[in-house]
Amino acid sequence: MSENHSEGASRPVISRRPAAGLRADHPVHVPGDKSISHRALMIGALAVGETRISGLLEGEDVLRTAAAMRALGAEVVRDAPGSWRVAGRGIGGLTEPADVLDMGNSGTAARLLTGVLASHDLFAVMTGDASLRKRPMRRVTDPLAACGAGFHTRSGGRLPMAVRGTGEALPLHYRLPVASAQVKSAILLAGLNARGETVVEEPHATRDHSENMLRHFGATVQVEPTGDGAGRIVRLQGQPELRAADIVVPADPSSAAFPLVAALLVPGSEITLAGVGLNPLRTGLFDTLVEMGAALTIANRRIEGGEPVGDITVRASTLHGVEVPPERAPSMIDEFPILSVAAAVASGTTRMRGLAELRVKESDRLAATAALLSVNGVQVEIEGDDLIVIGCGGPPPGGGLVTTYMDHRLAMSALVLGLTTQAPVTADDAAFIDTSFPGFATLMTGLGADFSCA
C-alpha cells in the first residue's frame, strides 16, 4: 500500500477457519519493531554523522516519521528494503519545515516528534488523519510547555497543532500521572537540548527503547527504582553530543503477536518466529499466554542493536483463563485486543485489569475490543478499566461484522478471531493494517490462513 492512504477507501476482509493448521517449513519473519524504528530515525537525525539502520519497519507510520525528519533538514535515504541511512543535524540543528508535518495515523510519531520540536528554535504545524486528529495531545504538550515551548491546538488538545519551539529549553522534572512510554520519551527527547538534568518519574515501568537507544548514541541516561519499587526514575543529562551509530531493528513483538496467537488457536499449527524483540518491558503478552497454557519456547537468545531478541516457536495449545494484573499492562498495552481473542477461545474467565490507557489509542480500544468479541457471540464485560472475557472453551460463534475504527490492531485481531470461529468474521476495513504490518495478509495466507476480500 502506498504512503498516502485515502481515508475514504475502505478494504473489508473476511476471515474463515482454515482446513488445516498454520505451518511454515522455515522461520517466519515479521516486520521490524515500530517503536524502535520511529526512535532510530528521530535520534539519528539528532546525532552527528551518518546512522545506518537495518530492519527498519517500512509501514505507513514509520514512513511518516522519515518524511518529517527530511522536512526538518535531516538527510534520510532508503538504500534497500529495510536498509536506511540518516545524516543527522546534531542536537538543536533541525531546521524549520516549509510545510505542515502530516503524521498520518501515528500517535507515537506525533507525540515523540512534539518532544523533538519543543526544544528547537523553530515553528512547525503538525496534523494527522481523521483518527489521529481525535487523539489527545495535552498529556504531552502540558509538561512540554513548562520547558518553554508554545502549543496551539484544536479544542480538547487535538491536532492540528502549531508548535513554537525554544532554543533555550528548561530541563524538566516530571511525574507521569499515568505510565506512558510515549510521554516519557517526548520529555526525554526535549531534554536532549536543555541545559541540566531532565528527570521523568513513572508509576510503572514502561518500554525503555528510548533510554536504550539514547545510550547507544552516547547520551548519559540513568535509571533507578521509585521508592515503592513499582516504577522508575529516569535521568538524562542534557546537551550531549550524540554520535551516529548502527542500529539493527528487531522483529516487532507486537506484530509477532498476531501470527503467534493464530498458531496457538488453530488446531494442528506450529510456527517459529525469527529474531523477535524480547525486551522485558514488551513481553507481557508472552508471559500471559504461557500462564494460560501456551506451548511457547524461545531459542537462540541474543543481543542485537542493544536489544534482546530470540526465536519463538509456538504450537497449538488448549488455553485457560487467567487474571492479568494492572502492573503488567504497560508491557503489553498494544496486545490486549489479540489477547482478548485468545481469551475468547480459552476455557474459563480472563480478567484484564487497569486498561485505562486503551481508551486513548487509535480508537477507544477498550470499548472496541469488547464490541469485536460481543458481535461474534463472545460474552464480554467492562467493569471500570477492566475487561472481562468469558471464554467459549472452543470455537466462538463468529459471523459478525467488526467495526475497526481505522485501528490496525483491531483489524488484525478480528482477522485472527475469524480463523477460530464457527462462522466467518468480517473486518470492515483492513487498509490500516499497513500502518504497522505491511504484508500481513500475505504472510498469514502463506501460513495457511483463509482471508478473502469482502
Swiss-Prot record:
Disulfide bonds: none annotated. PROSITE patterns: EPSP_SYNTHASE_1, EPSP_SYNTHASE_2. Pathway: Metabolic intermediate biosynthesis; chorismate biosynthesis; chorismate from D-erythrose 4-phosphate and phosphoenolpyruvate: step 6/7. Phosphoenolpyruvate binds at K34, G107, R135, Q182, R365, R409. The active site is at D334 (proton acceptor). Its EC number is 2.5.1.19. This is 3-phosphoshikimate 1-carboxyvinyltransferase. It comes from Granulibacter bethesdensis (strain ATCC BAA-1260 / CGDNIH1). The gene is aroA.
